[in-house]
Amino acid sequence: MDGRRFSRATIPIRINTPQQVSHAVITAAMKVHTEHGPGLLESTYTACLQYEPKQVGCRSVTQVALPVVYRGVELGYRIDLLIENLVVVEIKSVDGISPVRQAQVLSYLKLSGKSIGLLINFNVVHLKDGIKRFVNGTDWK
């Protein structure tokens, strides 16, 4: 050793599987919730959650369009966050997660062809109680 100290933040981390990305997003969400707690707007949590994964080299995109066409009429959905083009993240700040919101994430997975989705509700005392993970099939794309 030459006496230099390295923190985890200075060591490049390869994050390239849906499982690794999912773990990185959950870790980032925990950081955001620890700092800000419950009660903010979804848009604030989305901005914070987009920032954190970028710090470890992950690409993230907000408001990703999922077009659906029915009889010539374009309908569409928007994914809150898509991390590394692998993991769909739907962010909420509500009193409770209804089955409709869970079905929403499953629909996003089906329409996007992605294998892992996270539904994260920041309006809870302990964030572990606000995270639901969804898997679309068994193919880890």
Task: Give residue ranges: language-model regions.
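A short acidic/basic microdomain associated with nuclease active sites
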Residues: 54-69
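Nucleic-acid nuclease catalytic cores
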Residues: 92-139
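Solvent-exposed, charged helical/coil patches
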Residues: 1-57, 128-129, 133-141
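Short beta-strand or tight-loop elements
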Residues: 64-66, 77-79, 115
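Acidic pyrophosphate-coordinating catalytic loop
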Residues: 70-74, 127-128
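Conserved catalytic cores of phosphodiester-cleaving nucleases, focusing on short active-site segments
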Residues: 37, 79-97, 108
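Structural motif corresponding to alpha-helix initiation and N-cap regions
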Residues: 75-76, 102
